[in-house]
Structure formats: structure tokens, C-alpha cells
């Protein structure tokens, strides 16, 4: 964990990424935080140690991943966040507005429309988790080589008979697409 003059700022860092501006973007699990558990996406100026951007939510239950998690800065400046526990993926703008939101409907390999208590992970294994864990997600642009020749306009439900599991709040910029992960 990262400390600033003895005051701990990050409680379980994951997915550190060096950005083009020299800063580091990371996922902070936020577990065991004295003020209460809450996860965050954090950008740190490594020269000064200052947090220059951070995404958190006022509703801790909506964004908490006790272990694991990931972040990806997209070419349009937005950040893709993977909150592992609960299978929650979402994209936020630099102004911290959520523009895309997805919850995995796959619980231990089975597609379900509605999660039940049986889908929760026993507390002795993970805190605050469901069996729809997603370790990390990447956003690929339409020009990604693995997508060449694919019909990207074709849409089908993830789980038959269920509603859409994502919400696009505003049309996200797609001019500059994310490069392939390294």
C-alpha cells in the first residue's frame, strides 16, 4: 500500500498502469480502510505522490471489490473500471460521470437473469462478493486485429430471456480506440 507522510492512502492496489503523462493509474480495493471499505480508481503523480484524479462513489455497496480489480485509461480520456466482486464493469469520464455500466450475468458459469443468495460467495472465501467475478476487462476498438472480418453490428442477448445487462448513459466517444493490452 502507498503511504504519504505515514498516512495510508491506498488499501490494496491492483492493476498499476504507467500513463503517457508519467502518472500511475491503479485500482484501490479499499478493503480494511478505517473509514469503511470502498474501492476507488486512482491516478497518482509519481513525482509528487499526490492523487491527481480519483473515482469513488458515495454508495460503498455499489463499488467495492475486496480483492482484485482493474482499470484501463481509454484513448478518449475515460477510464474503464473492473470491480471484480460483483462482476461490475463501468466506464467513467474524467469528470467522473458514468457513461457505460455492465454487470456480468454469469454466476459460476451459469447465465442468470436475477442473482439470489445462493450466488453469493461464502464470507470465509471473499468479502462482499458474488459468484460472477470478473478479474479484468479490456476495451478493444473496432480496428483491433482480432475483430477484423467480424460483424460488430450483430447483437444477441447474453442470456436468453433476460433483459440487457448493460446501460449506455450517453454515447461514448469512439474516434480513438484503445490499443491492445500488453
Where in this protein do the model-derived segments appear?
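Histidine-/acidic-rich catalytic cores in large beta-rich domains
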Residues: 1-182
Amino acid at each position: 500500500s502507498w503511504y504519504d507522510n505515514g498516512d495510508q492512502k491506498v488499501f490494496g492496489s491492483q492493476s498499476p498502469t504507467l500513463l503517457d503523462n508519467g502518472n500511475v493509474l491503479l485500482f484501490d480495493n479499499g478493503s480494511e480502510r478505517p473509514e469503511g471499505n470502498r474501492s476507488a480508481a486512482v491516478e497518482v503523480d509519481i513525482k509528487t505522490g499526490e492523487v491527481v484524479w480519483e473515482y469513488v462513489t458515495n454508495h460503498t455497496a455499489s463499488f467495492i471489490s475486496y480483492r482484485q480489480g482493474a482499470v484501463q485509461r481509454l484513448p478518449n480520456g475515460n477510464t474503464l473500471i473492473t470491480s471484480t466482486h460483483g462482476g461490475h464493469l463501468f466506464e467513467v469520464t474524467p469528470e467522473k460521470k458514468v457513461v457505460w455500466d455492465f454487470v456480468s450475468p454469469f454466476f459460476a458459469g451459469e447465465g442468470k437473469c436475477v442473482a439470489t443468495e445462493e450466488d453469493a460467495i461464502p464470507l470465509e472465501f471473499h468479502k462482499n462478493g458474488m459468484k460472477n467475478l470478473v478479474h479484468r476487462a479490456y476495451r478493444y476498438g473496432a480496428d483491433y486485429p482480432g475483430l477484423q472480418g467480424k460483424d460488430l453490428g450483430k447483437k444477441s442477448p447474453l442470456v436468453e430471456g433476460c433483459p440487457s445487462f448493460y446501460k449506455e448513459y450517453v454515447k461514448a466517444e469512439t474516434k480513438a480506440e484503445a490499443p491492445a493490452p500488453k
